């Protein structure tokens, strides 16, 4: 049987051959062939890769790895020599009912560790959720009730299943070990930690300076989170880059407990689909939920700005770096249309969550609905001068200036359903669509226009606003 290195190499050779010869990834058997290769890769046994190869495969998708990639390779080597599994910790506080693809980035790495033969411990922070992670917050937040937590937990496991083999993973609640802890035990942990380590955090300093509130519970959040690492004796912890300071506290508390500090693997926080620079977030409406229907996963990713393609391909797919580099090279040389590359991304993510057939059905439906429509060919479209009406909100343009939508309420409902869009078309046939949110609907048109300047200011671009069937051209 071929080893994993040889299998990965053969898989990559086959995929890159398709990329070099495919006339168009938007349709046809070439896209299906690539999706089948990637589906096989998601389940590929990686246990016989060398420790260095394994460490490099993990590091390729991380924003920061501490202490270093060589030390990860050493840990992998030692585990192999001792015939033991590394314990890989990954936790989420159930502060919301939905998980989005931004949360899936460390899950994808966790899957790789599973396929290397290691043990992933998926920790649901039912205790820490009551405190609430203070990272990046500018104000305090009411604690969650037990009912809130149980409601949010209901769909967690179902949503993350595409990324984990739960037959080889533990699914734990940190109340198992945190609820019984005594006050003397907790004080014993705290007395070994300098307060200055927490007060040096920029987010804490900002909140204290502004007088917006910082509870003692929030101050010790990272310490409580560290007790999870101590309990399971974590070798590795996965998390988003925003969790880096919390994970560094985990290393310190583990060392104080006489344990070897865990290796930190921090993944980047991916930008939201709206292309404004804000990170993916349900509150901003610029997210792709793991509970979305196939057509919605596909459609939301197809609406993402072209410039997000490199980031999304590296973070969300099983494509290897040379394959991504080739895709971007072919796109830059116009040998592949950007919409074809975006179709591959959308189909691959839909396939990961819902399966190959669902991805194909979503692609077919999207193509039938959108791909043949060019607004530049639509006759008698009302034109509105942005310089003249830029102070009006997007909603006011449709309701008051153009009179194409009967009310602001209807426009907001359309926006919440994903039907409010900014569409930019170039003379070469390119079309880029940006989904606008309810917030955008209440924002001045000039501000929305400026926020998407990289899209609307391309050479020869014609720009349109669509609300349901209502259409406006912006000049």
Regions found by a protein language model. Give the residues of each.
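N-terminal Rossmann-like or analogous alpha/beta NTP/dinucleotide-binding catalytic cores
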Residues: 2-87, 94-222
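A short, small-residue-rich loop immediately preceding and capping a beta-strand
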Residues: 87-91, 236-237
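Conserved aromatic-histidine-acidic binding/catalytic patches
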Residues: 98, 238-241, 337
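Short alpha-helical patches at coil-to-helix transitions and adjacent helical residues
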Residues: 103-107, 180, 243-247, 391, ...
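Alpha-helical recognition segments enriched in aromatics with Gly/Pro capping
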Residues: 121-128, 153-168, 172-330, 348-350, ...
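Conserved nucleotide- and phosphate/pyrophosphate-binding catalytic cores
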Residues: 254-475
